[in-house]
Structures are given as C-alpha cells and as structure tokens.
Amino acid sequence: MWVRQVPWSFTWAVLQLSWQSGWLLEVPNGPWRSLTFYPAWLTVSEGANATFTCSLSNWSEDLMLNWNRLSPSNQTEKQAAFCNGLSQPVQDARFQIIQLPNRHDFHMNILDTRRNDSGIYLCGAISLHPKAKIEESPGAELVVTERILETSTRYPSPSPKPEGRFQGMVIGIMSALVGIPVLLLLAWALAVFCSTSMSEARGAGSKDDTLKEEPSAAPVPSVAYEELDFQGREKTPELPTACVHTEYATIVFTEGLGASAMGRRGSADGLQGPRPPRHEDGHCSWPL
C-alpha cells in the first residue's frame, strides 16, 4: 500500500540520479572498483621468471588491460596490453599477459628476468563504452638479484668434470689390472705352445735325419765268403775206393835169415812187432 503512495516524480528523480552517477548502470561495468595487483613485493634471481597477478571483479570484451611500469620520473610506461583475447607486447616480447580460465585473473609474466627489470609495476583497466575511463591498481615492486650459482650445500654432489675424470681413472685402472694378467697368460700359453711345437718338429726332424744317415754312417761290412781250393777238396766227399785185395806171402826163413829178416822187419816196422792192419786198408784180411 505504501508503494502505491510513492509519487512517480520521486521515482523518476531517483532513476535519473542513478543514471548520472553510474550507481546502477556504470558500476557493474566498471572494473576499477575491485582492481588488484599482487604480490606487492617480488624478488627473483637473474634469469628466472617473474609473475604478477592482476584481478578484475568483472570483465567484458569492451575493456582493455594494460601492464605499466613506473619510470624514475613517476611516469607510466606501457609494457604490454591485453585486448580481444590476445596479449600484445609493446617493446619486449618477454612481457606477456595470459588470461586464466576464470576470465577474471590475468598472469603478467616477465621471462628470463634481467637486472634492469627491477622496478614498480601496476595494471590498468580502460573502459571505452559508454565513456572512456581509466583506472590503475596499486603498484608492486620487483627486485631482480644476481644470478644464483648452484651450490652443493643442500644436495652435495661432485662436479661433473671431476666425477667423469675419477670414473675414467677407475675404469682405466681396472682395465689395466684385468688386462695385464690376461695378456701375460696369453703370452705364456703362446710361448708354451710354440716351444712344444718347435721341440716336436725338431724331434721329428732328428728322427728323420737319423733314419736317413744310418745306412751311410754305420755301414754293415759284407764279406764274400769264397771257398778255397783245399777247402773245396776237403768238403768234396770222396767216393769209397774199391777195396784192393793185396795178397801177402809169408816167407819163412831159417833162424838166421829169420832173425835178420825179423830184424829188418823190426827195423822197418818198429820194435813193436808186425804192424797191425789199418782201417784205411778196407776190410782186407790178412794175407794167408
């Protein structure tokens, strides 16, 4: 009932004020009321990447996002811009703006930072419709320190070159310790084999030479046995001769004659009396 009693003139006045001040229409489209840029302090080493985040409560395609840097004279220098869904570096391609999937946050990256990148950075939003308006976030400072060399305090490990040299030295020593005995063993086996082969060859050669030289070195005397004449005659069997029958006559003398005769016979045949018959005379009987 009370609403019906509100005069239309008052309602119209409120709408006009809201339109002029942007309380109802321009505020939803104005991102600068919730524009943030963090972290407020960022320290990185030279060569690393630095990342800031710019957040907007409401984003529309009519807005343009700028990434600025304050100069020593407190003037803003544009580094990159994001418009129509694209990152547009101004001078240095190391400055990039990436829109996150939630479409309200933007990562502003500096790749491969340098010492002269240190300074104060901020982001700014520009609204072109219905009126051109610019709003900037508070500044955040970036400090780029000297390049940090990798040390072995946290993860102690020898440098690659000494390690490689040490490993090479160990491998060389082990190879020498293993290779030298193997070479000596092979040399010894080869020497034994060669000496055995040479001795066998010499033994076989000496045997062959002995067999070849034996007929001439120790000749066997050969004697030609010839039969002598007298040996031939002795060996020739004589045929038994025919027995010659000899007749003897006995002469009887007187005593004187007999004595002389006997004396003569004795002188002829000896003192032993008449000679007995010999075997060579055959089977001759004494003469009658």
Swiss-Prot record:
A motif (ITIM motif) lies at residues 223-228. Changing Y248F: Reduced tyrosine phosphorylation. Abolished ability to mediate recruitment of PTPN11/SHP-2. One of its GO terms (cellular component) is external side of plasma membrane. Gene3D superfamilies: Immunoglobulins. Thymus-specific. Residues 25-169 are extracellular. Disulfide bonds join C54-C123. Residues 70-77 are annotated as: Interaction with CD274/PDCD1L1. Residues 191-288 are cytoplasmic. Glycans are attached at N49, N58, N74, N116. One of its GO terms (biological process) is negative regulation of T cell activation. Keywords: Adaptive immunity, Apoptosis, Cell membrane, Disulfide bond, Glycoprotein, Immunity, Immunoglobulin domain, Isopeptide bond, Membrane, Phosphoprotein, Signal, Transmembrane, Transmembrane helix, Ubl conjugation. Coiled coil: none annotated. Residues 277-288 have a biased composition (Basic and acidic residues). This is Programmed cell death protein 1. The lineage of its organism: Eukaryota, Metazoa, Chordata, Craniata, Vertebrata.
